[in-house]
């Protein structure tokens, strides 16, 4: 039987002004009840700059990930929702968001965790490292934490209903190299990924329904790896 103890702590400092800068720090300590331990750290830095008299916002967020050891349990989905390879200044969000009274439009780099199937408890919840989309992310290399990709996103709200839709490059990236960066658009190689969600909120409860379509098919090996 696999056991894992995780200690979580969060620090959310923020500086409020016309331009908003904030940071979120999450740490986990893992122990397999034998002799193996692991210490994971995730720092997210956010910057929002209002433009066009507040009708639009330049959004930027980076991820900084550090851990002391490799995965201590031989399960390719693992037990942590933040565990990933060490990385510095991976782009989570970088683009322009325009706001109307009941709608938003974003163009730039983004990932699915920013907008879809999010609630108070799914913002930080211990489950698979495939993120909040374990089935989709296990089948396709989408822009799911810790990866991002070029995106066109919009949402429309009316009453308690909200419809969201995003169109992404079919593969997510988190590097700073020529062939590994979230600004790549390669539909012939990576495919195109679209996800839609209908959300209903009532009396503090949220109900979700969604559909996702990918233009490519990927073979997943027994270790969970997908060929590039």
Language-model regions, residue ranges each:
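Outer membrane beta-barrel
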Residues: 49-170
